[in-house]
């Protein structure tokens, strides 16, 4: 049968009976939401004068004129004390996190009137004595620092409020309704009023028959399922139960209107991230990434930001000073003016301490966004800034590079509540809603991590030590969550969700659900696959699952033309990734390296090629007579000179210098050895191969890193590789055709190369050696013209690394017959694309694909 039990309605009947007998009572519930619900029930159904109904926290949260040490000031004081303690070396960030735990421990001891010496002798181990000395030192120093403020702590202030309330309500009947999370104040309240407190915690054994269970594949599919359920139940009052703020943010991305009782981390709001970004800029050396982390904040992002980002992509992304920003070639004055204003606002002043940083942060934020404090969370944030500025003396001398993490941590302690009036969906932790009744309860991510959450062990005190101090509050956690769960099951409809995977780990159902399986023989599904959870959310649709019918028969891109000039790398792209070729060569699209990207392997490869090219081309003029060490130094100096004129991060330059130095000697020895058997060597030589394909003239161009002609007229084309070299199989299949095509260029006289015995004539340039008759490569001119010889070809990949072995050579011999087969295959490939001009989306054999997102 459908459950119709309501905890608060049941209590309302109970209390009406008490009130009718003239009993004066004070009703205390765990939270404000439950109080509002109870008042509504009593007002709507019984039309009576309401008794005093308050949440427990209101007893210790009244506003008074008393001045007390704020939480943020107390954390900074304790953090300073922890950092001072040299036997346990904490950095600033660690000490602040430890301060949160130590603050709670100190307050528990003070409120319970417990002497810390109680635990000094419970364990005589050296480890424990070391911990005890640390805790005692911090406790005594804390007392000294608090006395200097001439204020009481917030905990003592709350205790005084509680004591005043205890005196005021003594001799009245007090009813504690529902389940309360144990804490030091509740414990004190119960002890002092044990003769006056009545506990009401009656529950029903009845369980709804409207319970359903569903396992989405991941947390995003779970969020889609929640949104789908809510969209199908708009006329119902829905509660989504979670105490995980990270998961809540995922769920809320798919919901329009909801009331949020969990609250938002102020650090993660747009306004919080704006201030954090400003502080990162002020506390660090100039960094474009940090600059655009600020500029792309939704509150200040604009078209000028996007234009500036495009200008700073590719090589400009490594500029190391704001002054270089104004040296850019601006397309229009508006962007230039925008850039100039940014520099004036962000980089004019250089604050030296934390107080200056906080003051300047506020000024910069107001210049960038004059209405900043009117935004969501603005009031809370300006109050936080004011307090932190007031107490900055505790951290004023710290290294400013540590401050962004400190600021972010402190900000994460501030909650901001954004609620939507008249929303039928409420998101809250279980303790806030367990006593209330809803049409539909959704229990997402129902596993042991969230139901019941594992209690975190204390970093310094063992469980036994906590029990000796009588401040161990974790014992009742599992019982509490079991009670919450039982109450939720008494609602009309309950849907339990548990994503199969989260953060890459398999999810294990909660033990509470395993108990439920014994109660309900067959859990049915109210979210069948045909309901279309995935299909209703187009933005989450998985393209891999779309059938051809969904997009028609078109799986290719079409063009009206085919390029007449191709590079050897274009040919490889055409083979491995036809759509990438289409996007690059026909649409003219080029991927820009955005400012977030670090220097790539290909950037390092280009640098090494430049170094080796300059060294090799100047070898005969400058380096041939040098000894090994001087040649090595010359190679390194070439690299340093190139890096000096290149815009790169300093750490990248140092890394590349180290790598160049590592393999420099090995390369010099490799070069000397190869030169011994060569009569001619050509470096970075341009070549071309001309073909007529289906009536269209095609020119393929390429640059050979190194071409060697041996004393026996053996020709080797070498390619320097700092990355992965292709396999022999890839070369044989034509998937890595660069050196094959360069060999065809040689075969077809595509390079402008000559020597006394062998002439390789570039047809395009029309070069002819004086006194020599050009011949087709594949034959040799010798003193005995009547005896032509076939020339051998070899292609070689030279792998260069910064670890041993520094230089490795992989050689593959090629015959004229093999080259002719490859040429026939190349012609066939080009004939297909020149004739059809269609490029498949689906074929993608590339290791790196800049156009994959476009093909979708």
UniProtKB/Swiss-Prot annotation:
InterPro entries: P-loop_NTPase, PDDEXK-like_dom_sf, PDDEXK_AddAB-type, Restrct_endonuc-II-like, RPE2. This is Uncharacterized protein RF_0624. Coiled coil: none annotated. SUPFAM superfamilies: P-loop containing nucleoside triphosphate hydrolases (SSF52540), Restriction endonuclease-like (SSF52980). NCBIfam families: RPE2.
């Amino acid at each position: 049968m459908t459950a119709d039990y309501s905890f608060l309605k049941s209590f309302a009947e109970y209390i009406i009976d008490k009130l009718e007998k003239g009993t004066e009572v004070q009703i205390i519930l765990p939270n404000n939401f439950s109080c509002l619900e109870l008042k509504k029930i009593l007002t709507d159904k019984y039309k009576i004068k309401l008794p005093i109904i308050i949440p427990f926290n209101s007893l210790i949260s009244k506003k008074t004129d008393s001045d007390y040490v704020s939480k943020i000031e107390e954390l900074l004081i304790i953090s300073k004390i922890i950092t001072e303690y040299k036997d346990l070396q904490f950095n600033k960030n660690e000490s602040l996190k430890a301060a949160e735990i130590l603050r709670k421990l100190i307050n528990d001891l003070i409120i319970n009137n417990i002497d810390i010496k109680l635990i000094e002798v419970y364990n005589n181990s050296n480890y424990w004595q070391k911990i005890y000395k640390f805790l005692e030192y911090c406790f005594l120093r804390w007392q000294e620092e608090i006395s200097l403020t001439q204020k009481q702590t917030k905990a003592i202030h709350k205790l005084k409020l509680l004591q005043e309330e205890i005196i005021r309500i003594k001799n009245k009947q007090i009813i504690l309704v529902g389940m309360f999370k144990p804490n030091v104040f509740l414990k004190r309240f119960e002890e002092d009023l044990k003769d006056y407190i009545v506990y009401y915690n009656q529950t029903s054994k009845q369980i709804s028959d409207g319970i359903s269970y569903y396992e989405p594949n991941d947390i995003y599919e779970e969020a889609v399922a929640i949104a789908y359920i809510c969209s199908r139940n708009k006329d119902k009052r829905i509660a989504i139960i979670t105490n995980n703020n990270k998961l809540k943010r995922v769920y809320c991305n798919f919901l329009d209107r909801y009331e949020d009782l969990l609250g938002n981390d102020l650090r993660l709001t747009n306004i919080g991230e704006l201030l954090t970004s400003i502080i990162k800029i002020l506390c660090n050396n100039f960094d474009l990434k940090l600059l655009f982390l600020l500029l792309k904040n939704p509150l200040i992002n604009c078209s000028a930001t996007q234009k500036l980002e495009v200008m700073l992509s590719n090589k400009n992304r490594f500029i190391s000073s704001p002054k270089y920003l104004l040296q850019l070639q601006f397309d229009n004055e508006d962007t230039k003016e925008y850039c100039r204003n940014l520099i004036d606002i962000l980089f004019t002043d250089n604050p030296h301490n934390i107080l200056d940083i906080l003051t300047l942060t506020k000024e910069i934020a107001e210049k960038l966004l004059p209405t900043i404090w009117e935004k969501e969370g603005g009031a809370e944030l300006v109050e936080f800034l004011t307090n932190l500025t007031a107490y900055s003396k505790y951290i004023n001398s710290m290294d400013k590079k540590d401050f962004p993490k400190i600021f972010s941590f402190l900000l994460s302690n501030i909650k901001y509540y954004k609620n939507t009036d008249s929303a039928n969906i409420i998101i809250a932790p279980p303790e806030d809603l367990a006593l209330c009744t809803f049409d539909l309860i959704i229990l997402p991510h129902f596993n042991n991590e969230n139901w019941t959450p594992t209690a975190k062990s204390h970093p310094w005190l063992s469980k036994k030590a906590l029990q000796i101090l009588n401040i161990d509050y974790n014992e009742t956690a599992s019982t509490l969550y079991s009670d919450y769960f039982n109450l939720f099951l008494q609602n009309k409809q309950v849907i339990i969700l548990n994503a199969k995977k989260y953060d890459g780990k398999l999810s294990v159902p909660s033990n509470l659900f395993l108990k439920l399986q014994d109660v309900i023989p067959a859990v049915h599904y109210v979210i069948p696959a045909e309901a279309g959870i995935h299909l209703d959310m187009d933005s989450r649709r998985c393209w891999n699952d779309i059938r051809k019918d969904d997009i028609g028969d078109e799986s290719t891109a079409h063009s009206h033309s085919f390029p007449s000039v191709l590079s050897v790398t274009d040919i490889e792209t055409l083979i491995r990734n036809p759509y990438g070729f289409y996007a690059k060569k026909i649409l003219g699209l080029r991927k820009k390296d955005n400012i977030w990207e670090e220097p790539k392997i290909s950037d390092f490869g280009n640098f090494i090629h430049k170094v080796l090219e300059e060294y090799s081309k100047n070898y005969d003029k400058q380096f041939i007579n040098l000894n090994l060490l001087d040649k090595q130094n010359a190679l390194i100096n070439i690299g340093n000179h190139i890096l000096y004129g290149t815009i790169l991060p300093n750490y990248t330059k140092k890394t590349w210098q180290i790598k160049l130095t590592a393999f420099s000697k090995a390369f010099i020895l490799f070069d000397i050895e190869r030169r011994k058997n060569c009569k001619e060597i050509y470096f970075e030589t341009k070549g071309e191969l001309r073909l007529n394909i289906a009536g269209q003239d095609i020119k393929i161009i390429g640059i050979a890193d190194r071409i060697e002609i041996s004393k026996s007229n053996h020709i080797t084309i070498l390619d320097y590789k700092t990355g992965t070299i292709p396999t022999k199989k890839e070369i044989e299949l034509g998937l890595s055709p660069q050196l094959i095509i360069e060999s065809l260029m040689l075969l077809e006289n595509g390079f402008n190369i000559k020597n006394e015995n062998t002439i390789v004539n570039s047809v395009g340039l029309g070069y002819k050696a004086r006194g020599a008759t050009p011949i087709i490569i594949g034959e040799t001119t010798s003193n005995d013209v009547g005896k032509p010889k076939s020339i051998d070809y070899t292609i070689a990949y030279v792998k260069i690394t910064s670890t041993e072995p520094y230089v490795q050579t992989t050689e593959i011999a090629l015959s004229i017959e093999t080259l002719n087969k490859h040429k026939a295959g190349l012609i066939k490939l080009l004939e297909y694309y020149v004739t059809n001009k269609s490029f498949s989306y689906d074929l993608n054999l590339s290791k790196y694909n800049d156009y994959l997102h476009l093909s979708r």
